[in-house]
Curated annotation (Swiss-Prot):
Gene3D superfamilies: 3.30.190.20, 3.40.50.790. It comes from Enterococcus faecalis (strain ATCC 700802 / V583). PANTHER family: 54S RIBOSOMAL PROTEIN L1, MITOCHONDRIAL, LARGE RIBOSOMAL SUBUNIT PROTEIN UL1M. It holds the Pfam family Ribosomal_L1. This is Large ribosomal subunit protein uL1. It comes from the Bacteria.
Length: 229
């Protein structure tokens, strides 16, 4: 096991591993135990009691956080004609079709989100093997396959985040930066929490949310008391 740094050891001393904190306390403590020298990301991690192998328990979607994430997302849009013009007007960083396919096949990945109009999915499908593993493949469930490219681009730029349960039932979502006011982080937390509660599959049995923790990029995890909200 790797030896923890002195900074991490000091950070861990501030956290009671046997305690579950209120959302407000967890956010404040996550910021206080941040050991990174940069403006680290604050993240919420969920452990859900679901079986992702079942189609109706594959929790996935997107939500616009009221206070954004603190990160400027670079958006690539696959569209033609008027839709391409709409995407550019909405603030898309890159817009194209076959030319973008060639760039990506050549190893170009200077973007964070990919949006496509439905008619372009046959073209984008050629990139499934490279975009899929990176979580960049457009999907109707996250609003990234749409004719309303203006809305899609504007939402991403406004702080839209995607979430998807992994094979172990975990979901990780950024809720802002250490530099954010605590109130803004709490508001973002409440937004994603409400969305995930509403996404509970009707077939899920037992306690739906098994655990919630808040952490920073290199900080310790702080357990959240679900009875506090």
């Amino acid at each position: 096991m790797a030896k923890k740094s002195k900074k991490m050891q000091e950070a861990l001393k501030k956290v009671d591993a046997t305690k579950a904190y209120s959302v407000e306390e967890a956010v404040a403590l996550a910021k206080d135990t941040n050991i990174a020298k940069f403006d680290a990301t604050v993240e919420v991690a969920y452990k859900l009691n679901v079986d992702p192998k079942k189609a109706d328990q594959q929790i996935r979607g997107a939500v616009v956080l009221p206070n954004g994430t603190g990160k400027t997302q670079t958006v690539l849009v696959f569209a033609k004609g008027e839709k391409a013009k709409e995407a550019e007007a909405a603030g898309a960083d890159f817009v194209g079709d076959d030319d973008m396919v060639a760039k990506i096949q050549g190893g170009w990945f200077d973007f964070d989100v990919v949006v496509a109009t439905p008619d372009m999915m046959a073209t984008v499908g050629k990139l499934g093997r490279v975009l899929g593993p990176k979580g960049l493949m457009p999907n109707p469930k996250t609003g990234t396959v749409t004719m309303d490219v203006t809305k899609a681009v504007e939402e991403v730029k406004a702080g839209k985040v995607t979430y998807r349960v992994d094979k172990a039932g975990n979901i990780h979502v950024p809720i802002g930066k250490v530099s954010f006011d605590n109130e803004k982080l709490v508001e973002n937390f409440n937004t994603i929490n409400d969305v995930l509660l509403k996404a509970k599959p009707s077939t899920a049995k037992g306690q739906y949310i098994k655990n919630i923790s808040v952490t920073t990029t290199f900080g310790p995890g702080i357990h959240v008391d679900q009875a506090s909200f």
